[in-house]
Amino acid sequence: MKKHRRRVASGVSLSGQLPTGPARGTGSIRTDAGRYLQAAARDDAPARFGSPPGEVDDTARRVWEVAFGLAVRRRFEPDAPLAEISRAVARSVHEHAAAALPMMDAEMLVRAALGETVPLAEIDPDVQVGVHLLPFASIADELALGDEELELLVAEAELG
């Protein structure tokens, strides 16, 4: 089976705004932000280490946050031990070492996605984007999400 990958143009604005008109089908990714996230999860995004090139609007950030939360909740039980979360975050941060993501911030974002109340106000928005993209990719890989499963997850996040 041949894999089809869509390249995401670099240096352009990324938006999470849904286009007008009917959906192309169940599970179909409809936003630039969704396509970028899918490409990042498949290690096919133009900016693999850190924030994507160009402008990122709030709706794109929201799509990535929701997708990250969906993936985190698939990977961890709500009452997962902190040690399990810490080990998984450490592996992910190490895997994407070139992005220099702060481990504690990444761990707090995972814990917040699991419903824990943690202080997020001090986390830099660019760090949040990096965590929502790169550890998301690690979790998608760990869960062995196939192309269809990943597309469904991202499409669900776009609906938010």
Residue ranges and their predicted role:
Residues D32, Y36-A39, E84, A88, ...:
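Charge-rich, solvent-exposed alpha-helical interaction surfaces
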Residues R42-P78:
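N-terminal interaction modules that seed assembly of large macromolecular complexes
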Residues L82-L109:
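Charged low-complexity stretches with an acidic bias
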Residues M108-G160:
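Amphipathic alpha-helical binding modules
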